[in-house]
From Swiss-Prot:
Similarity section: Belongs to the imidazoleglycerol-phosphate dehydratase family.
Keywords linked to the UniProt accession: Amino-acid biosynthesis, Cytoplasm, Histidine biosynthesis, Lyase
Protein name as annotated: Imidazoleglycerol-phosphate dehydratase
Name of the gene encoding the protein in the UniProt record: hisB
Stored Pfam families: IGPD
Organism name: Prochlorococcus marinus (strain MIT 9301)
């Protein structure tokens, strides 16, 4: 198992130009500029609470709307996580966390299984948080899941303020990802699967 669990992804299309660097064993240091301020704020949560070092730069057609950039950042970040995990030897694999933010409480449960699946249950009453379309939260996680190969369940326990709900979601996600990707010392570098392999399908 490599001592450096980090990766870099560059992805360029006619709509976006994105670079992502991640170090899974970092200190929560981040440099993020996607051109979408609220998305930047949420990505900082992933870095800070997951203790992942994260650098993300994105240039996209945000003069049209934020959809392409938001989705493509999710794609690139998912690919970066999958690449940094490699064969996923020695990881804890499963993660879960409840995160509160004032009146909001969100539960995230996930499995770095190589089997992409998203169950998403956030009830966001506001159509926008600032200038950010709240429909894009789900689109981000769809893109991430499909390119990281994780099974992800997001459940809103309670909450009324859309900003609080989304931020609690990202905080819970970051802590669950931290739990799942950390090294299990008792496993001695083996793959955490009775099949003997985990891969992104």
């Amino acid at each position: 198992m490599s001592s450096l669990r980090q990766s870099e992804i560059k992805r360029k299309t006619n709509e976006t130009d994105i670079s992502v660097f991640i170090n899974l064993d970092g200190n929560g240091i981040s440099e993020i500029d996607t051109g979408i301020p609220f998305l930047d704020h949420m990505l900082h949560q992933i870095s800070s609470h997951g203790l992942f070092d994260l650098k993300i730069r994105a240039i996209g057609d945000t003069h049209i709307d934020d959809h392409h950039t938001n989705e493509d950042v999710g794609i690139a970040l998912g690919k970066a996580f999958s690449k940094a995990l490699g064969e996923r030897k020695g990881i804890c694999r499963f993660g879960h966390f409840f995160a509160p933010l004032d009146e909001a409480l969100v539960q995230v449960t996930l499995d770095c299984s190589g089997r992409p699946h998203l169950s998403y249950d956030l009830q966001l009453k506001a159509p926008r948080i600032g200038n950010y379309d709240t429909e894009l939260v789900k689109e981000f996680f769809i893109a991430f899941v499909n390119n990281s190969g994780i099974t992800l369940h997001i459940n809103q326990i309670r909450g009324s303020n859309s900003h609080h709900i989304v931020e609690a979601c990202f905080k819970a996600f970051s802590r669950a990802m931290r739990m799942a990707t950390e090294i299990d010392l008792r496993r001695s570098g083996s793959i955490p699967s009775s099949k003997g392999m985990l891969e992104n399908q």
